[in-house]
Amino acid sequence: MSADIIKPGSPQYWGPRLWRIFHNLAEISDRRDIGMLWPNILKSTAATMPCSKCRNHLTDYLKHHKIISVTNPLTVTGQGIRTQIRNQLHHLHNQVNLRNNIPEFPISSLTHIYGNRPREQILAEIHSLMTEVKDAWQPLLHSSINPGDFTNWKNIISLLISLVSAGPN
């Protein structure tokens, strides 16, 4: 077995998949009723990630940055929610990249990489990636992941996926 093979339980395996899930979800987060879900999703992700360094960095980031900048997201249009989420995830992703000595990527690349596709295609990719992440994390339950946190994370992401599947509002 080659030392270059990335193990499913490692951040190098599930990290890129999580970013694709988040950026894809952000592309279709054009609903007024999901603004309060996003901070909870990221907090739940921080609690669930099997990498303590990643957990601590995300928790610290969330203490100092708001994902949604308004007190009542229902006062913002669906497109406004989408823009805030895309911008904040882009900033978060670049902060992680800088910490890991990976070059930043321009915000203009988000649409090229994640957008300009039918919602159904984006959702299909999200479902596939979610299966890969869940399968990678499942063996780590009890050792690196609290089962209750894992269940909460799956449930809250599933709720967001259900809402964005319905289209904009």
Model-assigned labels for residue ranges:
Residues 1-169:
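Aromatic-rich, lipid-facing transmembrane alpha helices and their immediate juxtamembrane interface loops
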